[in-house]
């Protein structure tokens, strides 16, 4: 039994949109405009430039996914290029980043929905956590039903997101194309230019809004014709996202003044309240809709990383066993349980900021591994080969995203992030020394196979074919 290659170009594109289009477009424009010194052309240029940088980085990852078209390809690739310890470190980072991030997103969805019924006062904690748990476990069930079910859900989610952004983009042209709106752009070039430090901060803010394309590398083993589908989807998909982000920002600037954007907690909600004041209540549901797809993609991504690590012997074999729907059900359940703990003990969700540095470190390690294998194994079949300067550009971008916050505003949090990374190496040493003595997992695996009706999957080398 193996994971099914069931995703074509359409469903892969929908998953990419679902993972990439998030609530960042509702919040980030405020910070970008602020760091751009209220200079509209500079602000829009940063959004466009970061879109191009995102395509560059995504195409580098596409070479990894097409050379090793497996689920959890990033882990498999790092282990073979930089060694087991580095691969385990990436696993350590993703483990915490996924379950803390998923828990935080579920809580945010629940808070947005329940807040509609408690206007003027904060939403109560107990109903919020109960709804968050219900949402989380519902997505866990969807993930366990197989990649086809996940794809159809993300298709619906993507259509909602694309419809909302198209509505925001086109409303200015159809409804609010008045002289007073257009006049705000007439003197845009007269604003002062930001300094290099401010531009760096703005780029850092926008970069978070383009995260999500790595989901295709994680599910490469379930994509039909990955050598053609992945590069094509990344180029067209991120280009569409970039255009939508630009049009949405122009719409914000046409309806709201720069000062209104700067002082808004959520630019998207403020825009909605200004343009459609009679349906203000729908804003919270739209924010929730933008997060639903991210939660679904997060669970799938995390379970595939568990699956790959299990096949490589880092985790017990139970995590790589598949159910009747060709899904690693135990890995799905494990992620949902860990995320449930994060929701119940909501205070630990704030730890997610300590693993943010690790996400950029993983991308840096992948680029170094890609560069290394280019020179050590130049004859490996590469269905898609990215232009070499793109790899160096991605390395420079990762270094920029890692060190800019440390240089601009050093804090104790950065020390905690480094300690977190070193803890990963400590856990690797413990895992390497205790793995051979943990015979109790064999008995547990047998019982779990009967309980969940799961069976072992094929060797990763066989799945590449």
From Swiss-Prot:
The record describes its membrane topology as: Multi-pass membrane protein
According to the UniProt entry, the coiled-coil residues are none
Primary place of residence?
membrane
**Keyword Transmembrane helix found:** yes
**One GO term (biological process):** amino acid transport
User: What family is reported?
Assistant: Belongs to the amino acid-polyamine-organocation (APC) superfamily.
State the remark under miscellaneous: Inactive as a transporter when expressed alone or co-expressed with SLC3A1 or SLC3A2. Functional as a transporter when fused (via the C-terminus) with SLC3A1 or SLC3A2.
According to the record's subunit comment, the protein's assembly and interactions are:
Probably forms multimers, perhaps with an unknown protein(s).
PANTHER family assigned: AMINO ACID TRANSPORTER, ASC-TYPE AMINO ACID TRANSPORTER 2
The name under which this protein is listed is: Solute carrier family 7 member 12
Taxonomic source organism? Mus musculus
Starting at the broadest rank, the lineage of the source organism is: Eukaryota, Metazoa, Chordata, Craniata, Vertebrata
């Amino acid at each position: 039994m193996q994971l099914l290659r069931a995703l074509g170009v359409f469903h892969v594109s929908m998953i990419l949109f679902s993972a990439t289009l998030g609530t960042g477009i509702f919040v980030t424009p405020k910070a970008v405009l602020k760091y751009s010194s209220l200079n509209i052309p500079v602000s829009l240029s940063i959004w466009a430039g970061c879109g191009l940088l995102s395509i560059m980085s995504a195409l580098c990852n596409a070479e990894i996914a097409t050379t090793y078209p497996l689920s959890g390809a990033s882990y498999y690739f790092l282990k073979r290029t930089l060694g087991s310890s580095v691969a385990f470190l990436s696993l350590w980072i993703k483990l915490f980043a996924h379950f803390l991030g998923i828990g935080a997103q579920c809580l945010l969805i629940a808070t947005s929905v329940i807040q509609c019924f408690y206007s003027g006062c904060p939403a109560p904690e107990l109903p919020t956590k109960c709804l968050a748990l219900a949402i989380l476990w519902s997505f866990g069930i969807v993930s366990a039903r197989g990649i086809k079910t996940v794809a159809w859900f993300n298709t619906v989610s993507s259509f909602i997101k694309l419809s909302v952004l198209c509505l925001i983009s086109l409303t200015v042209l159809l409804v609010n194309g008045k002289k007073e709106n257009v006049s705000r752009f007439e003197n845009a070039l007269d604003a002062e230019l930001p300094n290099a430090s401010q531009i760096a901060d703005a780029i850092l803010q926008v970069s978070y809004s383009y995260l999500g394309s790595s989901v295709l590398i994680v599910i490469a083993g379930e994509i039909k014709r990955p050598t053609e589908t992945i590069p094509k989807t990344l180029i067209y998909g991120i280009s569409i996202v970039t255009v939508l982000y630009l049009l949405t920002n122009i719409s914000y600037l046409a309806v709201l003044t720069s000062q209104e954007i700067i002082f808004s907690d959520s630019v998207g909600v403020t825009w909605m309240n200004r343009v459609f004041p009679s349906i203000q209540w729908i804003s919270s549901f739209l924010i929730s809709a933008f997060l639903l797809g991210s939660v679904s993609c997060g669970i799938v991504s995390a379970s595939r990383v568990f699956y790959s690590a299990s096949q490589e012997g880092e985790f017990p074999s139970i995590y790589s066993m598949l159910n009747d729907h060709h899904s690693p059900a135990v890995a799905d359940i494990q992620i949902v349980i860990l995320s449930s703990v994060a929701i119940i003990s909501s205070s630990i969700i704030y730890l997610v900021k300590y693993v943010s540095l690790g996400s950029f470190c993983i991308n840096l390690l992948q680029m170094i591994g890609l560069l290394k294998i280019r020179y050590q194994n130049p004859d490996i079949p590469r269905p898609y080969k990215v232009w070499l300067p793109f790899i160096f550009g991605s390395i420079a971008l990762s270094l920029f995203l890692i060190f800019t916050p440390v240089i601009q505003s050093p804090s104790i949090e950065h020390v905690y992030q480094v300690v977190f990374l070193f803890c990963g190496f400590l856990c690797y040493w413990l895992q390497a020394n205790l793995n051979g003595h943990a015979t109790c997992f064999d008995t547990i695996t047998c019982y779990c196979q009967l309980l969940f009706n799961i069976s072992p999957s094929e060797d990763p080398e066989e799945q590449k074919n």
